[in-house]
């Protein structure tokens, strides 16, 4: 699912065109689930094909039980007994270490093969039976995933599809991955329990406060311009990860958080109701406005839940103009035509769109499987268009969506703002400080991105506090969240992950010649002496014939030389004789 933001021009000349093209949407507390998908990749002639053959969702409570994945197959043709092999569940050494890229776990017939089974008495087979069965109702297949909670599914699991159990090579590769997606249709938001919402806000602010000192130190102007710290994408990523974890989005490990270089780092999330606690602008100092902040747009909805003012009444479910100038409470802002401010002047909003919003980092969440597919397309610019036709991608889930799904930005945050009298001053200050830190990041990234977009060397120096520790994917800077839920900055680890991503979606390589099969390879110590003996027996007659011909030739030449030797007349008398 691709997250969308609303970018509106600042000029007032084309207001109808702005909102005709992109209408902001309401946030209805969307639900997110872990979704499994199976993709089949095969070749016909010189053309490669890739198609998502089936999906299955875990329960809203998480992937706690075995999952049944229904799917179809396109590459097996009329074969009735296909076989699936995975490398991860092999127990034999030879099955795990021989011909991994070619056979994908089944170089021998004694390897762990998931042969198709018959339907069980209850209609489908349980995990105790064969996990790979045929669905007689739909004509497709069912694969039972016994451990959907395992991190390997988020990384992506690659398997081989064999037409039969005696096939030498797979006819296609199967990729199964688990991603975090928004559930459609989004259910209606429910009333939030006030004590729970207050507790959630307190937990969130405590995390923000613990990291605030370091962030403020990084963002505060130094005493000397020569000692100014460069902007760090890593700071933005860590801030977003902390907010996400504090908001209750769990299982964020073995994944990537990415920031787009050409997109603002902050996004304004519309709130469903007006701010309840308001004061006159004279009673509070007016904070500096923050321009060019996009408004988050939920693609599943067409209207905003609440607006203070709007040029078109159809854009909002409910509109209520303020009776006086207001000041937003801690953690909240007024969004008017891409500009954030803490105060709202009731006399100047009649011709503009103004909504109450919260502020979160604009990041994208990828699983390893998703990023591997995207990396394989970007590895060669010549093949991006061709591969994109056969490899549709679920790009990821916006961090703004994740926070909204957890209650922030809708019921929980709104109710907490309305109940600020029950919160301590320290909690209120922490929320406000967090928003100010993100606002400072917004101002820095706007100036930095303009220079970095034209100078990759400068960009490399600005990606992290201690060097280039982000993975560049097109125009996105991605950081890896390891198994501990922390941003990994180890360069060696990142390089290893980058190589794995480049190799993960490599096309199915042609199999080796028959004489290089693993079975034949094990017989080579016995076959080599036999082959040498056969070779000697084949060459011996030729060699003997050659040697015999050479001996005969040498004998003939020697005999002829003796016959043709020059004749010399023998003397008839003694030369020393004198008569």
Curated annotation (Swiss-Prot):
Give me the Cytoplasmic side stretches, as residue ranges: 545-579
The question of whether Manganese is a record keyword is answered with no
Map motif CX6CC onto the chain: 470-478
Entry superkingdom: Eukaryota
Q: Which residues form the signal peptide?
A: 1-22
Report the InterPro entries cross-referenced here. TLV/ENV_coat_polyprotein
Main localization is membrane
Q: Quick one: a GO cellular component term?
A: plasma membrane
Annotated membrane topology: Single-pass membrane protein
User: Where is carbohydrate linked to this protein?
Assistant: 135, 203, 242, 251, 276, 312, 337, 482
**Disulphide-bonded residues:** 470-477
SUPFAM superfamilies the UniProt entry points to: Virus ectodomain (SSF58069)
Q: Where is this motif: CKS-17?
A: 453-469
Name the segments for region: Fusion peptide: 388-408
Per the UniProt topology annotation, the Extracellular ranges are 23-523
- Motif CXXC, per the record, lies over 255-258
User: Which residues lie within the region annotated Transmembrane protein?
Assistant: 388-579
Record site feature (Ancestral cleavage site), residues: 387-388
Q: Where is this region: Surface protein?
A: 23-387
Q: Which UniProt keywords apply?
A: Cell membrane, Disulfide bond, ERV, Glycoprotein, Membrane, Signal, Transmembrane, Transmembrane helix, Transposable element
Q: Where does the sequence pass through the membrane?
A: 524-544
Q: Which PANTHER family match?
A: ENDOGENOUS RETROVIRUS GROUP FC1 ENV POLYPROTEIN-RELATED, VIRAL ENVELOPE PROTEIN
Provide the family line.
Belongs to the gamma type-C retroviral envelope protein family. HERV class-I F(c)1 env subfamily.
What's noted about domains in the record?
A: The CKS-17 immunosuppressive domain is present in many retroviral envelope proteins. As a synthetic peptide, it inhibits immune function in vitro and in vivo.
Record function comment: Retroviral envelope proteins mediate receptor recognition and membrane fusion during early infection. Endogenous envelope proteins may have kept, lost or modified their original function during evolution.
Protein name as annotated: ERV-BabFcenv provirus ancestral Env polyprotein
